[in-house]
Amino acid sequence: MDFDLPPANDPRRLAVKQWLAGHPQPTATQLVDAGYVVPHWPEPWGLNADPLHQIIIDDELAKAGVSRPANQIGIGWAGPTLLTAGTEEQKQRYLRPLLTGREIWCQMFSEPDAGSDLANVATRAVRDGDEYVVNGSKIWTSGGHLSQFGILIARTNPEVPKHEGISYFICPTDLPGLTMTPIVDSTGSHLFNQVFFDDVRLPASLRVGVEGEGWRLAKVTLANERVRLSSAGSLWGNGPSAEDLLDAVRDSGGCSDPIMRQELAALKCEAEVLRLNRLRTLTAQLAGRTPGPEASVQKAMSDDHGQRV
């Protein structure tokens, strides 16, 4: 396993540096136009970059203090699924606003009586001409109240084996009959929501893939949730890293509290573990292997680490 990234004079690294010199504070639109939001996506949204090229871009953006648009579910989950099974019209309509962060997305998978057991979803979508009539409820919808669209799975055929009767949809959050109820936690914070569908009419043109393909596409979505090549030590690829935190402590004169110093040292060690594990995943991909448990370890560890940072 090679833990060394290409040197400073690597042409790919120099190209990013040159672009950043001309765009020292790039807007989201400029980042999208350059292909730097999702370098591994195909053109015109990305650069068809291999994993190594993507990490080079990640490193150079991080060094320059540049953050990508914050739209985790849209960019990380909905986008790859649309690339996999969306129509050309769906890709042209939704991918660019999703990448710039102009349109925020949420996930509508879990249900009150099924939890994360997606095969047992009970929300129904009944075909009626050019529309589906949706009834049911979703829960733990993160950021739904801030989103313009959701990725929705619903049961379109209850007569077939449960894995075969689910379909996948793009769901605008402003449709008549769709309501969001806040779930307020013990601190008074509102991140999650319960979504209710009461005869919501969803155009059939918003179905992704063919009817009954929702189980397969949900697995595509969840696979992209688990494999993330975001910078080690940051939360969802955004916000400060452990190195940023240590730099801030140094710039402020250091830390004399021994307990806090131990915590900072632990964060630094964790960040290095995440960096090396990220490169292990990269090595597997470059060798043509499917990422294994290390991808799940990365997800579980990085979110907790990012919150602590």
What are these regions (language model features)?
Residues 101-109, 153:
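A short, Trp-centered hydrophobic/proline-enriched beta-strand micro-motif
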Residues 3-7, 178-276:
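Glycine-rich beta->alpha junctions and the first turn(s) of the following alpha-helix
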Residues 123-126:
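A structural signal for short hydrophobic beta-strand segments in well-ordered beta-sheet cores
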Residues 130-131, 135-181:
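A short core secondary-structure module
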Residues 1-72, 83, 92-100, 104, ...:
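Amphipathic, small/basic residue-rich leader segments at the start of a protein or domain
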Residues 21-22, 43, 47, 141, ...:
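Alpha-helix capping/hinge segments and adjacent helical runs
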Residues 258-261, 272-309:
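C-terminal helix-coil-helix/basic helical segment that borders enzyme active sites and/or dimer interfaces
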Residues 70-89, 115:
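N-terminal glycine-rich flavin-associated loop
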